Amino acid sequence: MRHAEVSYVDSAGAPVKPEEVPLTAAGREQAAAARDALAGVELDLVVASDLPRTAETAAIVAPGHEVERWPELAEWRGGRLDAIPPDELETSFVGALQVKDEAQRFLGGESLGEALDRVHPALERLLARAWHTALAVLHGGVNRIVISYALSGDRTYFGTFEQAPACLNILDLGEDGWIVRTVNYVPYEPLHPARTTTMEHLWEQLKPFLDERQ
């Protein structure tokens, strides 16, 4: 699943460090909805990245379980927005997770190829563990990498599906390979009334600050 809602801007609209943000009040409610959706599921293993927003989500969704924190499963690392030409910034930002070439970089930071090199070995290490049902609380970009691997079995990356806050993805792995059962199920809004992507929503939050800076 993806972590629940956070805010990447402070009360004044200025960006905050993404590696430090906690869940919002709405995010905690979203995580509780995911917990309720999984109430009948017996979890053998709970994994999160090393960032607070995934660990906090995991603690709400799977109370009583130890949460293993894996830094290799942190979100794609972006670069500096001021290094992107202003006339290209909006297009680059809202399409940052829809890259097609391994050399393309996430907002000027980590490339797709580098992210694959980091996430795929961690996924294989997770699969080598002995468990029946595991919960991995991760990030939108990392989830896309994992689901793409389940669909393709190789380094193919599909960036054009959405990962809403606190969404659930259900993947099975058996002797005959992967079965992708559910992608982007949102317990608190199952019909997806929002028409913006998560990156478009984040752009709307950041744009006033970026406009003032120019």
Regions found by a protein language model. Name each.
Residues M1-H3, E90-T91:
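Short, positively charged
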Residues R2-T57, V61, R105-H120:
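Loop-to-helix element that buttresses phosphate recognition and phosphoryl-transfer chemistry
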Residues H3-A4, S49-L51, E72, V137-G141, ...:
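Short, well-ordered beta-to-alpha junction loops that form the rim of enzyme active sites
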Residues S7-V9, T54-T57, W76-G79, R144-V146, ...:
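Short catalytic/ligand-binding loop motif for oxyanion handling, primarily in non-cytosolic enzymes
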Residues A32-Q98:
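Phosphate-coordination/substrate-recognition cap region in phosphate-metabolizing enzymes
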Residues A55, P63, P121-I179:
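Active-site-adjacent alpha-helix immediately C-terminal to a catalytic or transition-state-stabilizing loop
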Residues W76-D87, Y149-Q214:
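Acidic, low-complexity terminal tails and accessory targeting/binding regions
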Residues F93-E114, E204-R213:
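Short glycine/proline- and acidic residue-enriched helix-loop micro-motifs
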